[in-house]
Amino acid sequence: MKILLFVTLIALAFVALCSAEGNVVVLSPDNFDTVVDGSKTVFVKFYAPWCGHCKKLAPDFEILADTFAPVSNKVVIAKVDCDQADNKALCSKYDVSGYPTLKIFDKSTTAKDYNGARSVDELLTYINNHAKTNVKVKKAPSNVVDLSPSNFDSVVLDKSKNVLVEFYAPWCGHCKKLMPDYEILGNTYANEKDVVIAKIDCDAADNKAICSKYGVTGFPTLKWFGKQSKDGEKYEQGRDLDTFINYINKQAGVNRVKGGKLAVGAGRVEQLDTIATEFIAAAAEVRKELVKKAQTVVDSLPEELRTEGSYYVKVMKTIAEKSIDFVTTEIARITKLVSGSMSGKKADEFAKKLNILESFKSK
């Protein structure tokens, strides 16, 4: 009897686990009436796995479920896969003819269609209003600088910084569409001390004079304020991430890829690459002269490149003292170090060292 009870409990636990994905409750004919019982507000997504709009909505729907999880006694975020044979009658019952279809059961077993915007903020506001709750999304720290009259000049007109500014309005559809990629852009350049990704809300009364000053008449307007010119060059290229990144890399003289890692070749200096190639093929006496030649090049480099330049010289001296095997062992050592959870400036430093060491490998 005890064994039977134990097995039954395990089975029930398994069913419970299968009825949720994260904090999104998975509905089926077996549990629909139990969940949508009129005791709480239930927001349901009727979807199909192959539907492109459904796939696009999925991450935000999970955020929505996570946000309402602390008040799950009042609000449930759920979904029904209408592509599953067992669920087709359920989807038909609620007149689902396209995907995704969103419906709210407002402490009732009667559904109301939701036809508003599908952003997290819009959905959150809608459900809060119906359920009389006041939950808020915990937003991740942003690497996009918010501008206002109090900091615009100190950030944008700083001649030591390259600054991309988005002039936007919160109600603007194109601005909303750009927002996720613009956040990724901010993350991509977070470790570049000379590059700033910023935005200013032109709908805010205090900001209108600034937006007018820079000739903003439509949204979003993007302007580049480089170190050499603070007039604000209008950005008129594509708004996809790759185009943004290529533009900023070229304008600012940096070498980032999406997400913030350094691209292959970052930290390399062409003149020193040439000397490195000569160095590995040269005899001992010639190598001494090449070290001096490399140091002369380093001394002539801009301040921001001298750390990398000095590493070329350090590698040359180490090879001269030990052997060319140093390159292989050092690459292995650094690769092992960066394979962990290293990030930020240290990760950049080691990435540049790896790139420089590649220039000493036998061609």
Curated annotation (Swiss-Prot):
Signal peptide annotation: 1-20
SUPFAM superfamilies cross-referenced by the UniProt entry: ERP29 C domain-like (SSF47933), Thioredoxin-like (SSF52833)
Active site: C51, C54, C172, C175
Cystine connections: C51-C54, C172-C175
InterPro entries: ERp29_C, ERp29_C_sf, PDI, PDI_thioredoxin-like_dom, Thioredoxin-like_sf, Thioredoxin_CS, Thioredoxin_domain
UniProt main location, coarse: endoplasmic reticulum
A single Gene Ontology CC term: endoplasmic reticulum lumen
Alphabetical keyword list: Disulfide bond, Endoplasmic reticulum, Isomerase, Redox-active center, Repeat, Signal
Key word Signal present: yes
Enzyme nomenclature, EC number: 5.3.4.1
Compartments in which it is found: Endoplasmic reticulum lumen
GO terms under biological process: protein folding
PROSITE patterns: THIOREDOXIN_1, THIOREDOXIN_2
UniProt xrefs under NCBIfam families: pdi_dom (TIGR01126)
Family membership noted in the UniProt record: Belongs to the protein disulfide isomerase family.
Name assigned to this protein: Protein disulfide-isomerase 1
UniProt organism field: Dictyostelium discoideum (Social amoeba)
